[in-house]
A protein has these predicted regions:
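Terminal cytosolic tails of multi-pass membrane transporters
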Residues: 31, 39, 44, 48-78, ...
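Loop-to-transmembrane helix boundary motifs in multi-pass membrane proteins
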Residues: 76, 81, 199-205, 295-298, ...
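Membrane-interface loop-to-helix entry segments
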Residues: 199-249, 282, 305-309, 436-445, ...
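TM-loop-TM module centered on a large, flexible mid-protein loop between adjacent transmembrane helices
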Residues: 145-148, 152, 183-190, 260, ...
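Extracellular loop-to-transmembrane helix junctions
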Residues: 76-79, 89, 99-199, 203, ...
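Membrane-helix boundary/coupling elements in multi-pass transport proteins
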Residues: 139, 162-177, 281, 285-294, ...
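Hydrophobic alpha-helical segments and their helix-loop junctions in multi-pass secondary transporters
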Residues: 185, 231-259, 280, 320-329, ...
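Hydrophobic, membrane-embedded alpha-helices of multi-pass small-molecule transporters
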Residues: 79, 83-96, 204-207, 244, ...
């Protein structure tokens, strides 16, 4: 689309609205002269309110990019397949492998193995929908940006906001994991109540600042550093699982102490949402957000998503199996729910000590910090791209679109640093963990909807990966994502609801001057019944502080029915082709600014 000495844009503005075509010309000329722009909601509002859409439209000629001697920074498509895959693996193999086997076992006992299977299936479904999307629309901050092209401003702002909140909690969680595994070296990091001391809070903020600075060096430096760290993150947990499995394995643990599923179906489902399973596996999302900086994204993004999830599922499955089989009778005499490791060692290191593999304990101690360090590094970098996307959507101030000389959204990095640091002070660790899972999964529900929307809106686009049986597979993915949100419980839904209200108020404020007609309300009509239904069912249910009026089993049927109905509605409420074409024209202009002549 951008070739030769001139760039041609096809304008979506009808001939009979010349004043709107003139406004469009002004906005495109601002781009051509090096002035970044975000969407002018007022002009778009007038256009979509008054225009009768036609496809017989003129072309607008633009001269080459001129900057008046100022060198513009560009984003860099420099992440190859290995680095992209390792970005996802680093996100998945963060602090999750250190704590998730214990948390899942506490919730479900030996049936936690089933929880990993269900969770892995759910994440593969969601990843498959985004694999097709990212291959045809590889944009930076994809989780927040993709909905803009399928369902418009309100949906993209809502989903991007919830993802942004969740991403900021990820950095908080991983930093605290680093500190928890450093407690033996620096006991002053924590107070007698088990919470971070004032000195510990200061160190946590300094660590966040370090991750911010490292990401500011650019995506190429970030990718190389993460790749080196991720080799350690793969080899150590895989080696630990092999060592424990070959040292001692007690088959009785799978039948005694309450049986294979001591908490029944509810325990399995709780392990998926609040037992660390989804928190661990959802790290694949970073590939979607880094897709805008990937080489050959049409091929590399789908491959990275699938490879990373399969590799990490094998590692997590091995760790969980080893953990369950290595526990001795004294640790299980009070039941799975009371299982704990009160010493300074984490659960995996404690088990390695118990089976006599003392040589690996010191390796685990260092690897634990490296794993969390690398995951925090990835989450900070990924969230900066999401902040950039939210500025492009219009929810965040446009200064957050500014790129540094290394092509990094520097202001987005700095704002995210402040917000992530605040979570250390306002919520306890377990509530931050629950909010992380539910908010990020909520932002993912748009994937199954968008994949069908783009089958209509981008029907002729070549697809390196095609989701098989998309209507059925997409619907199933939407149902599974909805169930995961519900299983997080009523208490978490309350926190998520507060975050959504704050995001909605911010959206109203940001668009109060430009009018609200441009916000694609029709395309967002499915959000209100969906969110209200989830909140109501969560209150009626028995998970996480619910009233208990809706027992386990029937509640799954109710959530599934809600999800299917909303899914059908959401697919029908996709953007009209006219709006989609306009948004894509603006995106192409943005790409030329972000990536230079190679876009």
């Amino acid at each position: 689309m951008f070739a030769g000495s001139e760039t041609t844009f096809t304008s979506d503005f009808p001939h009979k609205h010349p004043h709107l075509e003139e406004d469009r010309q002004v906005r495109l000329e601002r781009w051509a002269t090096g002035t970044r722009f975000t969407h002018d909601f007022r002009s778009r509002s007038n256009y979509f309110r008054n225009a009768s859409f036609r496809r017989d439209i003129p072309s607008v000629k633009l001269s080459p990019l001129k900057t008046g001697g100022i060198v513009l920074a560009h984003m860099q498509r420099s992440i190859g397949l290995l680095s992209l895959t390792f970005v996802a693996i680093s996100g998945i193999l963060g602090s999750g492998w250190l704590f998730a086997p214990l948390m899942a076992a506490q919730a479900a006992g030996p049936s936690s193995l089933i929880a990993w299977m269900i969770g892995g299936f759910a994440m593969l479904l969601l990843a498959a929908t985004f694999a097709e999307i990212a291959a045809i629309l590889p944009v930076a901050g994809g989780i927040g940006r993709v909905p803009h092209f399928s369902h418009g401003s309100v949906v993209s702002m809502t989903m991007g906001w919830t993802a942004w909140v969740g991403y900021n909690t990820t950095a908080t969680i991983e930093v605290e994991a680093v500190l928890r595994y450093s407690k033996s070296l620096a006991p002053w990091l924590y107070g007698s109540d088990g919470l971070l001391s004032p000195a510990g809070l200061a160190v946590a903020c300094v660590l966040l600042a370090v991750f911010t600075v490292l990401n500011a060096f650019g995506v190429r430096f970030f990718a190389r550093l993460n790749t080196a760290l991720t080799w350690v993150k793969i080899l150590v947990p895989a080696g630990l699982a092999a060592v424990i499995l070959t040292s001692e394995f007690r088959y009785a643990n799978f039948s005694e102490y309450g049986g294979f599923a001591p908490e029944g179906l509810k325990g399995i489902l709780s392990a998926i949402s609040t037992g660390g399973v989804i928190f661990a596996l959802i790290g694949f999302r970073h590939v979607i957000d880094m897709a805008g900086e990937a080489r050959n994204p049409k091929v590399n993004v789908p491959l990275a998503l699938v490879i990373s999830l399969v590799v990490c599922l094998l590692i997590y499955g091995g760790l969980q199996l080893a953990f369950l089989g290595a526990l001795d009778q004294s640790q299980l005499k009070q039941g799975w729910a009371a299982l704990s490791f009160p010493g300074e060692l984490g659960p995996m290191a404690a088990l390695a000590t118990a089976v006599g593999a003392l040589w690996i304990v010191s390796i685990l101690d260092s690897s634990a910090r490296i794993s969390s360090f690398a995951s925090a590094l990835v989450s900070v970098g990924s969230n900066a791209r999401l902040g950039l996307a939210m500025a492009q959507n219009g929810l965040f101030p446009k200064f957050m679109e500014t790129l540094s000389a290394r092509g990094v959204p520097l202001f987005a990095l700095l704002i995210n640093f402040v917000v992530s640091a605040l979570f250390f002070f306002i919520l306890p660790f377990n509530e931050v963990l629950a909010l992380n899972t539910s908010s990020i999964v909520l932002s993912f529900v748009v994937g199954p909807v968008a994949v069908l929307a783009f089958r209509q809106l981008m029907a002729d686009a070549p697809r390196a990966f095609v989701l098989p049986a998309a209507p059925v597979t997409g619907c199933l993915a939407f149902v599974v994502a909805s169930l995961i949100i519900y299983w997080s419980g009523w208490d978490t839904m309350l926190h998520l609801g507060v975050c959504l209200v704050i995001g909605f108020l911010l959206m109203i404020y940001r668009n109060s001057r430009g009018g609200f007609d441009s916000l694609d309300w029709r395309e967002a009509a499915w959000l209100a019944p969906y969110l209200a239904g989830l909140v109501l069912i969560s209150w009626l249910g028995s998970f996480g502080g619910g009233a208990g009026y809706l027992p386990v089993g029937p509640d799954i049927a109710v959530v599934s029915a809600l999800a299917v109905a909303v899914y059908i509605l959401a697919v029908r409420l996709r953007l009209r082709q006219d709006k989609f074409d306009l948004y894509m024209a603006e995106e192409k202009a943005d790409e030329r600014m972000e990536y230079g002549d190679g876009a």
